[in-house]
């Protein structure tokens, strides 16, 4: 398997409004960008008076319950984030191209049920529109790369149910990195990996699991994706925040 010298960058929703503070033009050239948008979703839901329930998985990861109404808000919000990120990159001289999962770049399958811990019990929820990523349309992404830097929204398309899906941006970035055989997966977040308030500069590839107990929420998810990416052939994973960077290799 030949891995290519390009990177996949995940721009977290938490840094979209502060991107100029962490923006480095050299890392965005010859790259594919994936982004989040949680803040945008929360803001739009609040504006519309829609209550968005936050749940916790049995593994301790917090996620948004995506009903059909929440899905509509989610798509509108992350596409707004997509437009703003593309606009920012173009102002910096990067020929960015907005890409939506609705255009079948990310193929997914709607989860038949999701599990959440509610009142101390593991419950099954079936009315959810979140998805599992099944396939990345490599040919379509490479065609976009011929003319610029693709900026991919975290939306998948389920061809069986003919519906768009809420998919996690970190997982999209991981799957895109593997599909494109990228050497580097780069997370731009609000913070690097911390222990007791101190940035951990390096994590050896064979010791990632040792750091799991010191992580939670979105950072736990990033470490999980980093472990899977390294095990699958990605050479290094970087978590860069406003306070420094953590290199996993």
UniProtKB/Swiss-Prot annotation:
The record marks 10, 222 as: Transition state stabilizer. Keywords: Amino-acid biosynthesis, Arginine biosynthesis, ATP-binding, Cytoplasm, Kinase, Lysine biosynthesis, Nucleotide-binding, Transferase. Its EC number is 2.7.2.17, 2.7.2.19. It is found in: Cytoplasm. One of its GO terms (biological process) is L-arginine biosynthetic process. Pathway: Amino-acid biosynthesis; L-lysine biosynthesis via AAA pathway; L-lysine from L-alpha-aminoadipate (Thermus route): step 2/5; Amino-acid biosynthesis; L-arginine biosynthesis. It catalyses: [amino-group carrier protein]-C-terminal-N-(1,4-dicarboxybutan-1-yl)-L-glutamine + ATP = [amino-group carrier protein]-C-terminal-N-(1-carboxy-5-phosphooxy-5-oxopentan-1-yl)-L-glutamine + ADP; [amino-group carrier protein]-C-terminal-gamma-(L-glutamyl)-L-glutamate + ATP = [amino-group carrier protein]-C-terminal-gamma-(5-phospho-L-glutamyl)-L-glutamate + ADP. Coiled coil: none annotated. GO terms for cellular component: cytoplasm. InterPro entries: AceGlu_kinase-like_sf, AcgluKinase_fam, Asp/Glu/Uridylate_kinase, LysZ. Involved in both the arginine and lysine biosynthetic pathways. Phosphorylates the LysW-bound precursors glutamate (for arginine biosynthesis), respectively alpha-aminoadipate (for lysine biosynthesis). This is Putative [LysW]-aminoadipate/[LysW]-glutamate kinase. It comes from Pyrococcus horikoshii (strain ATCC 700860 / DSM 12428 / JCM 9974 / NBRC 100139 / OT-3).
């Amino acid at each position: 398997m030949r891995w290519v010298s390009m990177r996949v960058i995940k721009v977290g929703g938490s840094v979209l409004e502060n991107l100029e503070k962490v923006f480095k033009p050299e890392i965005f050239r010859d790259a594919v960008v994936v982004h989040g948008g949680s803040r945008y979703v929360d803001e739009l839901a609040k504006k519309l008076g829609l209550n968005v329930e936050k749940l916790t998985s049995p593994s301790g990861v917090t996620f948004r319950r995506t009903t059909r109404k929440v899905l509509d808000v989610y798509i509108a919000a992350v596409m707004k984030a997509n437009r703003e990120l593309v606009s920012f990159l173009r102002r910096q001289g990067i020929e960015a191209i907005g890409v939506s999962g609705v255009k079948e770049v990310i193929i997914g399958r709607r989860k038949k049920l999701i599990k959440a811990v509610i009142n101390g019990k593991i419950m099954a929820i079936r009315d959810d529109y979140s998805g599992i990523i099944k396939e990345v349309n490599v040919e379509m992404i490479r065609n976009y790369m011929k003319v610029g830097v693709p900026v991919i929204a975290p939306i998948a398309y389920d061809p069986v149910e003919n519906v768009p899906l809420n998919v996690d941006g970190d997982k999209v970035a991981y799957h895109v990195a593997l599909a494109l055989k990228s050497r580097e997966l780069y997370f731009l977040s609000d913070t690097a990996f911390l222990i007791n308030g101190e940035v951990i500069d390096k994590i050896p590839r064979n010791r990632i699991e040792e750091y799991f107990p010191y992580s939670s929420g979105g950072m736990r998810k990033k470490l999980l994706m980093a472990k899977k990416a390294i095990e699958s052939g990605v050479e290094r994973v970087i978590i860069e925040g406003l306070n420094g960077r953590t290199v996993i290799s």
